[in-house]
């Protein structure tokens, strides 16, 4: 730091801890009054005590004993396990943040997370076992993939996905029993294996441009009653496919619209579903057989 001397000039000043009073970093606070005494003269000012440590843009340490954290703008990435098992209610992620590492919030008590528009990448298992997390608004982010196991066993009730999203990873919403409805963005072309397996969804809106819905993507969703399509996007992919057993074990399913881009249906697509009364199949789909709609015999 610099000091202004009696001659009116500013020069560097060396300050020791003995010359500082009122400062404590034991508890994070928004405002703390600090006084510096040099040669009998005092100067007081306010400082902010951050609950985190940041090195070269990476979040490296989080202090305990807080309920809410607002990350400073200097954070560019959150590393693996950063908030794992933490007892925290709210985290405000800063504008400028680019990525969040594997299992960053694994088994934490977080209830609310504010996501920035600058976020581009999520890694796997981020919100695994986050029972208290009820809503995730990712709609303003720039992520292109929701990775594998993002919300497994989370208490999520509402998820808003960004228009930039192109892929939903395997088991992304596995065992999310509180999730009731979801609209999948129009640019999504791939839905991974068991992406919504045993979730609580009742309705799903699929984009017409989707070309790959992996096996058991909606396997055993006991409350799923309606799968509809929307959007004008059409992908002319001869291999576009809904893979086997995608909707097997959805006993309440009554309406199923197959996206316009799909060409191939896997076997056992609607296995065990006896309440389907409305089925819409695009003209481009290859011949449909009995085994597509039922469990094959062995």
What are the residue ranges of the model-derived segments?
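Secondary-structure transition/turn motif
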Residues: 39-40, 58-68
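Surface-exposed repetitive/solenoidal architectures
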Residues: 51-58, 77-85, 104-106, 128, ...
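Solvent-exposed, low-complexity, repeat-rich "mucin-like" stalks and linkers
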Residues: 1-10
């Amino acid at each position: 730091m610099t000091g202004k001397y009696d001659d009116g000039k500013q020069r560097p000043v060396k300050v020791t801890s003995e010359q500082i009073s009122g400062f404590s970093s034991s508890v994070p606070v928004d405002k703390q009054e600090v006084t510096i005494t040099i040669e009998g003269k005092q100067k007081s000012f306010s400082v902010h005590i951050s609950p985190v440590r940041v090195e070269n843009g990476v979040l490296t340490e989080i202090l305990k004993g807080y309920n809410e954290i607002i990350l400073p703008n200097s954070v560019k990435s959150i590393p693996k396990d950063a908030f794992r098992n933490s007892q925290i209610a709210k985290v405000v992620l800063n504008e400028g943040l680019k990525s969040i590492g594997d299992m960053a919030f694994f088994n934490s008590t977080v209830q609310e997370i504010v996501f920035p528009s600058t976020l581009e990448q999520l890694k796997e298992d981020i919100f695994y076992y986050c029972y208290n997390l009820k809503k995730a608004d990712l709609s303003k982010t720039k992520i292109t993939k929701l990775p594998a196991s993002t919300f497994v066993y989370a208490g999520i009730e509402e998820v808003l996905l960004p228009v930039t999203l192109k892929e939903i990873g395997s088991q992304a919403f596995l065992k999310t029993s509180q999730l009731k409805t979801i609209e999948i963005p129009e640019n999504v072309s791939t839905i991974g294996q068991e992406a919504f397996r045993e979730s609580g969804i009742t309705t799903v809106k699929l984009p017409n441009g989707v070309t790959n819905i992996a096996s058991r993507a909606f396997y055993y969703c006991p409350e799923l009653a309606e799968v509809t399509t929307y959007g004008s996007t059409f992908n002319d992919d001869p291999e576009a496919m809904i893979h086997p057993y995608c909707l097997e074990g959805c006993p309440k399913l009554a309406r199923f619209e197959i996206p316009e881009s799909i060409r191939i249906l896997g076997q056992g697509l609607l296995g065990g579903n006896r309440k389907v009364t409305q089925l819409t199949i695009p003209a481009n789909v290859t011949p449909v057989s009995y085994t597509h709609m039922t469990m094959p015999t062995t």
